[in-house]
A protein has these predicted regions:
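Solvent-exposed interaction patches of small proteins and small membrane subunits
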Residues: 1-129
């Protein structure tokens, strides 16, 4: 008997969930420079995976998702994310931590629990589709 091959979206969702779990784990660690750096790096990975998932969902529904902003707007417009979510701030903070040297790392670190919650809500809605 053949097993059902998971779709690209299912695979991306499982990777998204894995990244959420790792972000949650690192946020529960002590607040040393090492773990703060690890949390910021994990945030970057989770953000990237979020966009991959949004692009896959948008593509499968023939919806626009060319830029980060457009992907998040598509998610809001289709009820995948809350309208008041902090995605604009999240996108700006993602850009800040990816500058060399990273900008405002301590400030961004302080927002990661909120961003994790936003990612988790998005994951729950997408998984239910």
């Amino acid at each position: 008997m053949l097993k059902k091959v998971p779709s690209e979206i299912q695979i991306l969702l499982s990777h998204f969930e894995w990244n959420l779990q790792r972000l949650d784990e690192v946020l529960k660690q002590e607040q040393s420079d090492y773990f703060k750096g690890a949390a910021l790096q994990r945030f970057g990975h989770t953000y990237d995976m979020t966009l991959k998932v949004l692009r896959a969902f948008a593509e499968s529904n023939n919806l626009p998702c060319q830029t980060d902003e457009q992907c998040f707007e598509t998610a809001v417009n289709n009820g995948w994310m809350e309208k008041q979510s902090d995605w604009k701030e999240m996108a700006a903070d993602y850009q800040r931590i990816n500058q060399k040297p990273p900008q405002d790392a301590e400030t961004v670190y302080g927002k990661l629990a909120t961003f994790h919650n936003t990612f988790s809500q998005l994951f729950a809605k997408l998984k239910a589709i």
